[in-house]
Design a protein with these regions (language model features):
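Bacterial N-terminal signal peptides that target proteins for export
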Residues: 1-11
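Metallo-beta-lactamase
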Residues: 78-80, 86-88, 175, 182-274
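PEST-like low-complexity, intrinsically disordered acidic/proline/serine-rich tracts
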Residues: 22-41, 58-60, 65, 90, ...
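Accessory terminal helices/loops
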Residues: 14-43, 241-244, 255-322
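Divalent metal-coordination and catalytic microenvironments
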Residues: 59, 73, 83, 97, ...
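Conserved beta-strand hairpin/beta-sheet module of binuclear metal-dependent hydrolase folds
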Residues: 51-97, 197-201, 205-211
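Extracytoplasmic/secreted envelope proteins and their assembly/folding machinery
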Residues: 57, 70, 90-94, 121, ...
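Active-site HxH/HxHxD metal-binding segment of metal-dependent hydrolases
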Residues: 95-177, 194, 273
């Protein structure tokens, strides 16, 4: 089954995929890359073969394709998953895991509420414990439309009696497991959404950022689900101070570094400050978006064509209205 979501504007980075300027960040052959970078998003046909596995350590794997990047952490008692992609990919994930371990999935952690990260939850056994931040549980139950997107994305949870919704939540921090199996969850404040969870695999020195850091480009700032332009940079700065982390799993791009994450926060801080300065100077959003260019100091970030700056416009709008 293919899912196509019609965008109101070109989505550069974020919840769905990496688009203009981040194409170089995409792993080759990745299922779920944008079809031509515009119009719609092709998540590919759900299948075991369409899931690409990247080994990060002997117990931590990254599964690409079908939506957001999924992390699989093999512990003594079972597998902890981070994010489960769009609908239809739950069973392929389960089957793919059987090539890595004979242990069952016991826990799912969702980084945020968006459908390309949580819909697969509903396809796992109801005995699997789903863990999120308190705000993300609320947003998953409300199932608000994503700001800036159009498309029919019905809740996968309402149709099956709530299977896949969070059973356990946390406010600021939560640790799951102990020793080499310990996973630490953090909520640093709103950014991409109002409930973004940062997942730290302590023994691997790896952190999953979800779409709070989807890749090197403009993120979606989903104000319908608590996202914030004004607090984005501060939230990223807090996450970048996480100790003993060397690598960062992005929401849709390649694995990056803490330095990349820190730079991403600064990039968004500069964008928002410039957008607010333009408003104060009496410019329109369209004038600001047409004139703004990525500062040269940000390597790996590119300027989309003038006709394809919809995500910049959306983010400037969020900043102006917040």
């Amino acid at each position: 089954m293919q899912r196509r979501i019609v965008l109101t504007s070109l989505v550069l980075v974020g919840l769905l995929s990496i688009a203009v300027g981040a194409a170089q960040q995409q792993p080759a052959g990745r299922a779920g890359a944008p079809a031509g970078g515009r119009g719609g998003i092709n998540f590919g046909t759900p299948s075991v073969d369409n899931l690409q596995v990247e080994k990060l350590t002997d117990t931590l794997y990254l599964l690409r394709g079908g939506g957001g990047n999924t992390a699989a952490f093999i512990t003594a008692n079972g597998v902890l998953l981070v994010d489960t992609k769009v609908s239809g990919w739950g069973q392929p994930i389960i089957q793919k895991l059987k090539t890595l371990t004979d242990k069952p999935v016991t826990t799912i952690v969702n980084t945020h509420t968006h459908f390309d990260h949580v819909n697969g939850n509903a396809e796992f056994p109801p005995t699997v414990e789903v863990v999120t931040s308190e705000p993300t549980k609320q947003y998953m139950e409300q199932w608000n439309p994503v700001f800036g997107l159009q498309g029919d994305n019905p809740s996968p949870f309402k149709a099956n009696g709530g299977v896949g919704l969070p059973k356990r939540t946390f406010k600021d921090t939560l640790s799951i497991g102990n020793g080499a199996d310990q996973v630490d969850l953090y909520f640093h404040g709103p950014a991409h959404t109002g409930g973004d969870t940062w997942v730290v695999f302590r023994s691997a020195r790896v952190m999953h950022a979800g779409d709070a850091f989807a890749g090197k480009n403009a993120p979606i700032m989903d104000k319908n689900n608590g996202g914030s332009a004004l607090r984005y940079a501060d939230t990223i700065a807090k996450a970048a101070k996480t100790p003993n982390v060397d690598r960062v799993i992005t929401g849709h791009s390649t694995t990056m570094t803490i330095a990349d994450l820190r730079e991403f926060g600064e990039f968004n801080g500069d964008f928002v400050r410039d957008a607010l300065a333009a408003k104060k100077a009496g410019k329109t959003i369209d004038q600001f978006v047409a004139e703004w260019n990525v500062p040269a100091k940000y390597t790996g970030y590119t300027n989309p064509p003038a006709t394809n700056r919809g995500q910049w416009r959306s983010n400037a709008q969020v900043a102006w209205e917040e």
